[in-house]
C-alpha cells in the first residue's frame, strides 16, 4: 500500500491529505506540516541539457496555469533589538554561509517521486518528468515526457505521479516550494508525448479503467485550503470532465486512493474524529459508489482489500485505539466487521501494507519501533523489535509480493535499508559502511513524571564521550497537537549539533500521537494544559538528571508546536535561554473565533469553539501564548514567518512579536538600569507556503542565533554543517 495507511492516519489531522506511493508531503490545517521536506535533497547532477533536447509537444487543449508571484515590498521584518557585538568568529560564519548559499544549484536535486509501473520507472530528472526501463533506472538513459518549465512556475517540482493502468497516460501533480497551489498535468504517452490537459488545485488523484477499456481519472479539487469536490475525467476522443460528489459539511474534507490491488477506489470523507468511506468498483467506475459505513461521530476507519475481503483499520469499540477488522466486500456495514488483530496498549499504528499472503503493520510501542507480520492464511503473527536507535520509518515503493522493504532513520542518522523476506521469515539489513554516529553517540529513552503523575516519554541524543553533561547545551523539541508524532527523520543540522557536543531532547507530550489515540485525546480541547505540564516536566527532569541547565537550554517548535512553546515562555521562562519558532501558531483565541478563515471549522475539535462555548473560550484564554504575554523576563526568541502563509497568517505573528516587545520593554523599565533585555527577532521570508524547504540560509540563521545567545563558538559547527548537507 506504500504509505497509504500512514497518510490516512495523518489525514485525520490534515486538511489536504496527499496519498502514498509518491512520497509526497502532507499539509495540515491551520498550523502544521506532517512530513517536512528533510529527506528530499540528495547530491546529484541535473541533466538539464539532455532534458531540454526532447521537449514534448503541448496540446492546444491543455491549459497553462499562470505562475504566482509574491512581494515583500510592503512588509518589513521587525528589527533585532539590543543587538550584541558581533562575535570574533563572525567572519568564519559568513564565509561558510556564503559557501552554503552559493553551492552550484545543479549539484542538488529533489529526491525523485518515483513510481514503478509495468516495465518502467517514472520520476523527476532535473526539470523534467521522465521514465526509463526498470533495469536502467540508475542510468542516464531515460525518455523525457514533460518539461516542467512549460508551466512557467518558479522552481517547480513533481509532488505525485499516477500512471494509467495500460500506460496510455501519466498524471503528475506539480507545485513550487513557496506556494501550496498545484497543477495536475495529464501526459499522453507516445513516441512524442503530448500534454492532454492540466487541472489547477488538485489534491489527490487516481486512475481506473472502465468496461470499455477507457482510462478514467478521479481527482479532488482544493478551494481555499478545503477539499470537498470529487471529479472524474476522460481524455482522447471521448473527453469528459464532471463533478460527481460534493461534501456539504465544511468541517470534513475528501481524499482518494486505490486499494493496493487496484480493485477499489475509495472516497474518504473525514474530519479530526469521524470518517466515512465510499467504494468505487475498479471494474465499473461509472456505477454509483457504495457506502461502507455511514459516518458515526467518533468512529474512524480506513479500508484495504484482498481476495474479496475488506480489511478495516478502525477505532470502533473498546479500547478506542486502532484495531484491524475484516468483512466480506459485499457486506461492508459495521455490524459485519469481525475483529482480526488488536494492538497493545500505548501503541501507535504508523503504517500498514497488504501483500498476497501477509499483512504488515508498522508500529510504535512505548516509543520503540516494531514490525508485525500477520500471515493471512493461518492468522500467525511475527513481531519484530527494530534497532533501538531507529526513530522513524520511511516506506519504500514496492510491488514485490515476496519482500517488504523499508528504511529506518533517526534525527542524527541517515536512512538505512531493511527488507523483510516472507519466505525466510527474517529481516535483512543493508550491509556496507557502518555510519560512525553509531559509535560516537547515544540514544536514550527516558520518562518524565508530569503534574498528574502521567509518564511522558522522551528521546535523548548526545555524544558518548561527553563529560559533565550538565555543562552542555541542550536543544528541546516539542509539538503536541493533532495526534501527530514529533518528526524524527534525519536532519543534518541536528547531527552537527550532537557532533559539537549538544544534547538533543524530543519531548513526546500529550496532544501528539506517540502513544496512540488516547494520548492525543488527553492533550486536546480542554486538556491542552496537559501538554504544557508535560513539557515543563520533561525539561525539569532533564535538568534534574544532569542534562544541561537553564542557562544552556534552548527550545524549538514548528507550527502548532508554537502553542506549547509560547505558553512555556509565559509560564516558566526561567527554564529557557533561547527559543526558535518557525511559522508558529501563537494566537489560538482570535484565530478560532474568526470563522472567515478557511480552516477554522476543521480545527474546532482540536482547539474548541470559543465563539459558541464559553468554557472553551475561557480555557483557551488560560494558555494562549498571545493572550498571556505579560511584563516579565523572557528568553531570547527567533521567529521565522512566511509572507503569504495561508495557514498561519503573518498578521498574527507580527501582533505577537509587537506585544511581546512591549511587555519586555515595560519589564526592563520597571527593573531599572543594567537589565539585559532578550533579543526578539522576526525573520519574514517571502513565499506563501506553510511548508518551506529547509534552505541553507534558514538553517544557518537559526543555528547562528542559538550559538550567539548561549555565547558559544560556532566556527567548527558550520564547517561540519557544510559537510553533512552533502549527504
From Swiss-Prot:
The family note in this entry says: Belongs to the peptidase S9A family.
The active site lies at 559 (charge relay system), 645 (charge relay system), 690 (charge relay system)
Q: Which InterPro entries match?
A: AB_hydrolase_fold, Pept_S9A_N, Peptidase_S9_cat, Peptidase_S9A, Serine_Peptidase_S9A
Q: What is its EC number?
A: 3.4.21.-
Subcellular location(s): the record lists:
Cytoplasm, Cytosol; Golgi apparatus, trans-Golgi network; Cytoplasm, Cytoskeleton; Golgi apparatus
Swiss-Prot/TrEMBL keywords: Cytoplasm, Cytoskeleton, Golgi apparatus, Hydrolase, Nucleus, Protease, Serine protease
- What's the protein name? Prolyl endopeptidase-like
* Function per UniProt: Serine peptidase whose precise substrate specificity remains unclear. Does not cleave peptides after a arginine or lysine residue. Regulates trans-Golgi network morphology and sorting by regulating the membrane binding of the AP-1 complex. May play a role in the regulation of synaptic vesicle exocytosis.
Amino acid at each position: 500500500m506504500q504509505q497509504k495507511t500512514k497518510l490516512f492516519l495523518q489525514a485525520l489531522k490534515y486538511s489536504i491529505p496527499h496519498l502514498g506511493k509518491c512520497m509526497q508531503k502532507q499539509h495540515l490545517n491551520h498550523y502544521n506540516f506532517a512530513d517536512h521536506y528533510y529527506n528530499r535533497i540528495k547530491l546529484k547532477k541535473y541533466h538539464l541539457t539532455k532534458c531540454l533536447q526532447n521537449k514534448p509537444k503541448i496540446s492546444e487543449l491543455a491549459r497553462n496555469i499562470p505562475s504566482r508571484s509574491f512581494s515583500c515590498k510592503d512588509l518589513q521584518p521587525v528589527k533585532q533589538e539590543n543587538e550584541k557585538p558581533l562575535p570574533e568568529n563572525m567572519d568564519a560564519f559568513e564565509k561558510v554561509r556564503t559557501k552554503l548559499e552559493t553551492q552550484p544549484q545543479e549539484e542538488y536535486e529533489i529526491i525523485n517521486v518515483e513510481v514503478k509501473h509495468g516495465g518502467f520507472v517514472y520520476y523527476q530528472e532535473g526539470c523534467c518528468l521522465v521514465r526509463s526501463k526498470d533495469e536502467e533506472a540508475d542510468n542516464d538513459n531515460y525518455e523525457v515526457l514533460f518539461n516542467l518549465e512549460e508551466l512557467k512556475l518558479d522552481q517547480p517540482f513533481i509532488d505525485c505521479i499516477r500512471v494509467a493502468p495500460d500506460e496510455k497516460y501519466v498524471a503528475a501533480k506539480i507545485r513550487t516550494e513557496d506556494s501550496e497551489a498545484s497543477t495536475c498535468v495529464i501526459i499522453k504517452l507516445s513516441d512524442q508525448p503530448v500534454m492532454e490537459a492540466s487541472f489547477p488545485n488538485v489534491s489527490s488523484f487516481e486512475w481506473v479503467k472502465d468496461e470499455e477499456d477507457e482510462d478514467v481519472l478521479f481527482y479532488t479539487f482544493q478551494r481555499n485550503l478545503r477539499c470537498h469536490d470529487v471529479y472524474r475525467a476522460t481524455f482522447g476522443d471521448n473527453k469528459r470532465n464532471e463533478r460527481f460528489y460534493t461534501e456539504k459539511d465544511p468541517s470534513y474534507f475528501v481524499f482518494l486512493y486505490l486499494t493496493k490491488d487496484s480493485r477499489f477506489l475509495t472516497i474518504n470523507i473525514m474530519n479530526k474524529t469521524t470518517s466515512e468511506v465510499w467504494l468505487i468498483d475498479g471494474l465499473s467506475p461509472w456505477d454509483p459508489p457504495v457506502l461502507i459505513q455511514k459516518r458515526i461521530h467518533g468512529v474512524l476507519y480506513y479500508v484495504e482489500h484482498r481476495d474479496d475481503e475488506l480489511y478495516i483499520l478502525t477505532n470502533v469499540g473498546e479500547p478506542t485505539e486502532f484495531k484491524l477488522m475484516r468483512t466480506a466486500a459485499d457486506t461492508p456495514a459495521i455490524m459485519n466487521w469481525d475483529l482480526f488483530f488488536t494492538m497493545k496498549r500505548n501503541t501507535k499504528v504508523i503504517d500498514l501494507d497488504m501483500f498476497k499472503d501477509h499483512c504488515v503493520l508498522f508500529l510504535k510501542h512505548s516509543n520503540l519501533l516494531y514490525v508485525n507480520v500477520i500471515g493471512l492464511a493461518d492468522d500467525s503473527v511475527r513481531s519484530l523489535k527494530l534497532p533501538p536507535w531507529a526513530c522513524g520509518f520511511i516506506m519504500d515503493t514496492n510491488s514485490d509480493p515476496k519482500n517488504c522493504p523499508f528504511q529506518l532513520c533517526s534525527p542524527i542518522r541517515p536512512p538505512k535499508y531493511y527488507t523483510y523476506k516472507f519466505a525466510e521469515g527474517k529481516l535483512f539489513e543493508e550491509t556496507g559502511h557502518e555510519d560512525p554516529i553509531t559509535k560516537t553517540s547515544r540514544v536514550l529513552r527516558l520518562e518524565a513524571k508530569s503534574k498528574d503523575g502521567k509518564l511522558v516519554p522522551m528521546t535523548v541524543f548526545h555524544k558518548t564521550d561527553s563529560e559533565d553533561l550538565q555543562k552542555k547545551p541542550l536543544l528541546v523539541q516539542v509539538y503536541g497537537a493533532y495526534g501527530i508524532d514529533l518528526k524524527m527523520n534525519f536532519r543534518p543540522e541536528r547531527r552537527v549539533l550532537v557532533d559539537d557536543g549538544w544534547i538533543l531532547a524530543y519531548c513526546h507530550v500529550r496532544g501528539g500521537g506517540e502513544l496512540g489515540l488516547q494520548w492525543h485525546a488527553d492533550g486536546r480541547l480542554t486538556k491542552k494544559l496537559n501538554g504544557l505540564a508535560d513539557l515543563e516536566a520533561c525539561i525539569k527532569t532533564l535538568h534534574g538528571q544532569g542534562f544541561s541547565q537553564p542557562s544552556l537550554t534552548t527550545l524549538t517548535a514548528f507550527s502548532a508546536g508554537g502553542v506549547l512553546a509560547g505558553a512555556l515562555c509565559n509560564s516558566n521562562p526561567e527554564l529557557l535561554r533561547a527559543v526558535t519558532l518557525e511559522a508558529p501558531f501563537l494566537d489560538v483565541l482570535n484565530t478560532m473565533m474568526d470563522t472567515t478563515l478557511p480552516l477554522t471549522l476543521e480545527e474546532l475539535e482540536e482547539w474548541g469553539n470559543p465563539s459558541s462555548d464559553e468554557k472553551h473560550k475561557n480555557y483557551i484564554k488560560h494558555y494562549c501564548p498571545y493572550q498571556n504575554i505579560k511584563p516579565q523576563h523572557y528568553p531570547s526568541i527567533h521567529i521565522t514567518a512566511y509572507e503569504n502563509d495561508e495557514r498561519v497568517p503573518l498578521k498574527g505573528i507580527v501582533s505577537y512579536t509587537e506585544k511581546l516587545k512591549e511587555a519586555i520593554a515595560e519589564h526592563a523599565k520597571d527593573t531599572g538600569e543594567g537589565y539585559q533585555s532578550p533579543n526578539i527577532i522576526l525573520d519574514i521570508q517571502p513565499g506563501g507556503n506553510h511548508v518551506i524547504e529547509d534552505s541553507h540560509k534558514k538553517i544557518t540563521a537559526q543555528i547562528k542565533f542559538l550559538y550567539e545567545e548561549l555565547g558559544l563558538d560556532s566556527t567548527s559547527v558550520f564547517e561540519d554543517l557544510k559537510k553533512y548537507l552533502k549527504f
